[in-house]
Amino acid sequence: MADLIVGIQWGDEGKGKVVDALAGEYDYVVRYQGGHNAGHTIVVDSKKIALHLLPSGILYERCKNVIGNGVVINLEQLLNESKAFGNLQGRLFISDRAHIILPYHEILDIAKEKSRQSAAIGTTGKGIGPCYGDKVSRNGVRLMDLKNLDKLREKVDSIYQHIQYVQTLYNVELPSVQSVMEHIESIAPQILPFVTDTTQLLWAAQNRGEKILCEGAQGSMLDIDHGTYPFVTSSTTIASGACSGSGLAPRDIARVIGVAKAYCTRVGNGMFPTQEDGEIGERLRQAGGEFGTTTGRARRCGWFDAVAVRYACRLNGCESLSIMKLDVLDGFERVKVCVGYEYEGKQIDYIPTDYDNVKPIYREFVGWDKTCGVRTFNALPSQAQHYIKELEKIIGVKISMVSTSPERDDMIMLG
């Protein structure tokens, strides 16, 4: 059976730390969607380790790590990231069905974003959307294509016949087919030894009774179907994406663990009802180090949105919830939680499709002094204990972990 870690907000929730805390119990850790727009940061002995494509299980020698078919891969990024961990042969497996982000995807991503002007999505400009677009239009390049570079050249040449209009439409210059192929040919020999049919690999692992942990990227509120559209990512970020992005069946998923911060953040544009633009937002940003792992952009910050978290937990079928960065709220006299919205003159406790026009209804809690570094629930200040217990009641999902600092060992396990 497989367990699943999924983000419950707009990404950057701390999924990497949760995976790191649990990965030692598993034989396989699987990334199943997204690309190098994801950024999982783990702190080991005060040293930050940032992962963009590699599964977080890479930090455990016994873990085998799988990049599934639902991931879109920048080959150069993957190669550079892998080098930092030495010889990964036998520990890293990449799906031959995963799609490749090619140089022109990044150019298209940036050009399209600029053309949107005031309606810009806030994309990372990493080529993720255009790559998924080619996948859906059945015009993409997969890892399996690296095995026959002559046929791949023909495919890239054919793709270019369909995208030449882009140069005029967006006033950009695309790299030549020759330069794209040279780029691929220089990297392919170093990537191919890791490429395999990972679906068969995972099925075989299941038959042997081995334990699998699936690791989501981004967050549920960025899901292409159920997120704050159009300000979303291009993949299925909720639990169902773990099946389509890995080859596992729905019945193979034993439990889903949601991950949320004790407050909310968002990168890029789009709806964010509890955002605080002033002193509170800046205090959360600085205390939480809220700057993107991938882009370095300052994250928008605000109070915990229990309505959004409850919605996302229901979408994912969460058995439990991990609350991260509780320590960032240390020292606040009052802590707010959004428990409902004002919408069209009424009070509601759900997320409408017209999410841009809601106003948060808050419940206030008495703040606390210090939780940083605390590792047992009873050692938390009584006000912080009350906050966690009330979140559990409001959301209706058991809270099983609470993080109290960036350090990997500062985690309260509640069973």
From Swiss-Prot:
It comes from the Bacteria. Its main location: cytoplasm. One of its GO terms (biological process) is IMP metabolic process. Gene3D superfamilies: Adenylosuccinate Synthetase, subunit A, domain 1 (3.40.440.10), Adenylosuccinate Synthetase, subunit A, domain 2 (1.10.300.10), Adenylosuccinate Synthetase, subunit A, domain 3 (3.90.170.10). Its cofactor is Mg(2+). It catalyses: IMP + L-aspartate + GTP = N(6)-(1,2-dicarboxyethyl)-AMP + GDP + phosphate + 2 H(+). IMP binds at D12, E13, G14, K15, N37, A38, G39, H40, T124, R138, Q218, T233, R297. This is Adenylosuccinate synthetase.
